[in-house]
Amino acid sequence: MNSTSTSDVIGRRVEVNGEHATVRFSGLVPPVAGLWLGVEWDNPERGKHDGSHEGTVYFKCRHPTAGSFIRPHKVNFGVDFLTAIKNRYVLEDEPKEEETEQIVIIGNKPVETIGFDSVIKQQSQLSKLQDVSLRNCAVNGAGDKGEIAKACPNIRSIDLSKNLLSSWEEVIDIADQLKHLEVLNLSENKLTSPSSSPSPTGTFPTLKVLVLNRTGVTWAEVLRCASGWPVLEKLYLESNNIIISERPTDVLQTVKLLDLSSNQLIDENQLFLIAYLPRLEQLILSDIGISSIHFPDAGIGCKTSMFPSLQYLVLNDNQIAQWSFMNELDKLQSLHALSCTRNPLTEGSKDAQTTRQFIIARIGQLRTLNKCAIEPEERRGAELDYRKAFGNEWKKAGGHQDPEKNRPNEEFLAAHPRYQALCLKYGAPEDGELKTQQPFLLKNQLLTLKIKYPNQHDQKVIEKQLPDSMTVQKVKGLLSRLLKVPVSELLLSYESPKMPGKEVELENDLQPLRFYSVENGDCLLVRW
């Protein structure tokens, strides 16, 4: 049992054949003689019972199959922090039959030594360490007081994930000796709740990044400890079954990134409790099951006072199925980047490009969507396509090209809160843009079009047959080869006998001709 006495093992974290558990019981289990340890496994499938044996309850487990009885000699209680560091980072000299003479420099004078170099090497290796990874190294605590500070005083980043730390007090004993600590990963350590008094202010005076994924930490524990993280900027709380039960008061005010992914009990009302963290710039809400959001303090076309600094929002793997969700995100005053993959809204559509365009059009200040930058040309095309796609619905709801008569009803404005702004930006859609497309038949595939060059009087009007499925980009490519003009310089529009005096620009290179309702007999206008 690694020299650990049986009197102080309750609550200790242990490792058995690569699996981690917490000791819940130590004693006799009749009728079998000898000492047993009752453990609750992190993986409930590893156990056999709930802590009971032949009708007697020896300890309790959260899961009915998470418990086991194990002989003490099979249990690993781990090692202290410094031992783990030496095991991982100190290069031991190979054993030699005879010690060889070594030369070291003390001051400016070379000195001959025998066997002294290994001590210097160890001290040098440890004192230089800044970034330390001790993941799954069975670390159980700080060890002798002050030894960490003496051996490795320059550590700035530690990965202590999946170790045998069992309490916040053990973590504090380590951190107190590392005066430059900025990054700490405690994921997959099952830490017991701190004492009723909060962590001493200044326990982690330089800590900027704290990772507590899969630790079982509660929101109340986070707030209780947070006074000890006065300059914390990034906090990761993934997979903890967290319920946000109260608003942070005088804590977490410096946090810029908060990761609450895979906490399936969080809903929109709980999110409002963290909506006024003043410096929160990045919020990660992947896989929390959220399907709706509404900012009650902001009406149509207005910005919410909630999440005032939020720039990047991650909503992957949720249950978002309604466009109203995107409309609400437009109310966030600082939102510039959104990731929203693997949601019913984005996965249900056969046309991923159209879905992307509609998200861009609905969130006016967005600069990045799903990690892809939104260039000005893409935004313009997306907004024009969106304006056209819902133009007929806008007219039926009371929309009109004449500003004096343009009064769409409240239902339309609620469904499309940016539509009026887009009409002001680009002009209201003309009737010609809103023509109903003809059914896609074989005879409609080829269009006979005239091609004119309004600014090039020496160019003759020509006639071409083009598929109505041909994209604007491919039309430009064809004309570029024909005219010996770079694609980037070409501007396309068209006019139709059905719309005398009107000219429709073909702004989006990715759309086919039929999207713009180009028909037989229409005329392409090419400028450069």
UniProtKB/Swiss-Prot annotation:
Keyword set includes Acetylation: yes
N6-acetyllysine carried by residues: 464
Gene3D superfamilies reported for this sequence: CAP Gly-rich-like domain, Phosphatidylinositol 3-kinase Catalytic Subunit, Chain A, domain 1, Ribonuclease Inhibitor
A GO MF label: alpha-tubulin binding
UniProt subcellular location: Cytoplasm; Cytoplasm, Cytoskeleton
Domain CAP-Gly: residue ranges: 27-71
Family membership noted in the UniProt record: Belongs to the TBCE family.
Protein name: Tubulin-specific chaperone E
Species: Bos taurus (Bovine)
Lineage: Eukaryota, Metazoa, Chordata, Craniata, Vertebrata
